[in-house]
Amino acid sequence: ILIKESSRDTLATALSVTVDPADGLVIGVVLWSGGSGVEFVGCTEITNDSGQSDVFYSDDTGYPVDSRTSTNPDNSSYLLFNVPAGGPYMFTGDTDGETTEADAPMVFAEAMTFVYLIYDEATWATNPTPGGCS
């Protein structure tokens, strides 16, 4: 998905990030999928093998901020700028020691790639968000 340069730059400026136009943007969400539908998973730390370690997690309004160190239980989305074009890249979510993975087969320059990390009911009977997560 292509993203308007002005939209990308507005987000980057708000987060004090300098955008490299040769790189891409990755956005995603961490979910638990069960019989009753899907739920956000909070307190998940995202890592990946792209070389980009600056992950921005959403606040209660769904806007990415630089003050969170893991996903918000009320909006578990995340954002990475300057992910090198290429791939494939593996993204890992770690929720209190419970991990799940998803791959991004390709990241394109000046484009947005979505990566959904799913904890499924077959492996996790309940949402793995730890108690006390905020």
Predicted regions and their residues:
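Structured interaction patches on ligand/partner-binding surfaces of diverse proteins
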Residues: 1-8, 83-86, 94-134
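Short, ordered, surface-exposed loop/turn motifs in non-cytosolic proteins
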Residues: 24-26, 32-65
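Acidic surface patches and DE-rich sequence motifs
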Residues: 32, 48, 59, 72-73, ...
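Short, acidic Ser/Thr/Gly-rich low-complexity loop/linker segments typical of extracellular
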Residues: 50-79, 105-107
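Surface-exposed beta-loop interaction hotspot
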Residues: 1-33
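A glycine-anchored, Pro-Gly-centered beta-turn/N-cap motif
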Residues: 74-76, 84-88
